[in-house]
Amino acid sequence: MSEQLIQAVNKQVANWTVMYVKLHNYHWYVKGKDFFTLHEKFEELYNETATYIDDLAERLLALNGKPIATMKESLETASVKEAAGNETAEQMVQSVYDDFTVIAEELKNGMDLADEVGDETTGDMLLAIHQNIEKHNWMLKAYLG
């Protein structure tokens, strides 16, 4: 198995681990007229994120990789950053949109690496995540106007 592919998948474990905590922060601290809508949306997203973390980590183990499993490693490795803690509702949505945009590009890179080594299973897993976040980003962009 390609070490580059293992690193790319591990980066996604780190990204989604940071997103999981960030989305909880947003779920708990969102305020304003869109509270009910965003509170539910952030919960939906962190539940989905939990599935990604587990699926990606287990795939790494199946490939004899070692998934990142601490917040310290996740924060050091991830392309996305944790929540600042004082965002407005609109800033929260913009941040998730921006993070998903970064992750989508990295997923494409991972799909290319999987294709190069003939790992259809990993490629399909990354594609499924990519499809989901593209749909979420369409909705988040519509919310932002």
From Swiss-Prot:
Keyword DNA repair in annotation: no
Segments traversing the membrane: none
Swiss-Prot/TrEMBL keywords: Stress response
Inducing stimuli: By heat shock, salt stress, oxidative stress, glucose limitation and oxygen limitation.
CDD domains the record matches: DPS
InterPro entries cross-referenced by the UniProt entry: DPS_DNA-bd (IPR002177), DPS_DNA-bd_CS (IPR023188), Ferritin-like (IPR012347), Ferritin-like_SF (IPR009078), Ferritin_DPS_dom (IPR008331)
Gene3D superfamilies tied to this protein: 1.20.1260.10
Gene Ontology molecular functions: ferric iron binding; oxidoreductase activity, acting on metal ions
Family statement drawn from the similarity comment of this UniProt entry: Belongs to the Dps family.
The name this protein goes by in its record: General stress protein 20U
Taxonomic lineage from the root: Bacteria, Bacillati, Bacillota, Bacilli, Bacillales
